A protein has these predicted regions:
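Conserved functional hotspots at enzyme active or ligand-binding sites that engage polyanionic ligands
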Residues: 1-115
Length: 115
């Protein structure tokens, strides 16, 4: 259940629970980067997010978070998924990611989402 009144927006760092999952999907309670617009989430109750792992192993479709943010680790851009913000626990983790980092994440998303 989302904190009262909070609607995730692009660039927010949040905590959520990704369970249940299947196969190699990221699971469990973990931070994530919101990549969908606030208006989308407000109208649909869904947020598109990229999970974050604390195990940093640079991979072409991942982005390491810079120091100084409230969450440390690596954004798993290739694990992008939508979550139901009304059915899953969603907690704001802190400040929005810097614009240059958001641009890198966007470019990596575009590199493999080609429709």
């Amino acid at each position: 259940v989302t904190e009262a009144g909070y609607v995730p927006e692009a660039g927010d760092l949040i905590w959520t629970d990704f369970d249940p999952t299947r196969g190699r999907e990221q699971s469990g309670r973990r931070p994530a980067l919101v990549v969908s617009a606030r208006t989308f989430t407000a109208h649909t109750g869904l947020a598109v997010v990229c999970p974050i792992t604390s195990r940093v192993r640079p991979f072409p479709t991942s982005v390491v978070l810079p120091p100084g943010l409230p969450v440390a680790g690596e954004i798993l851009v290739s694990h992008v998924r939508s979550i139901d913000t009304l059915a899953r626990p969603v907690r704001y983790a802190g400040a929005c990611v810097p614009s240059p980092l958001a641009q890198v994440v966007r470019a990596k998303l575009y590199s493999f989402i080609t429709i």
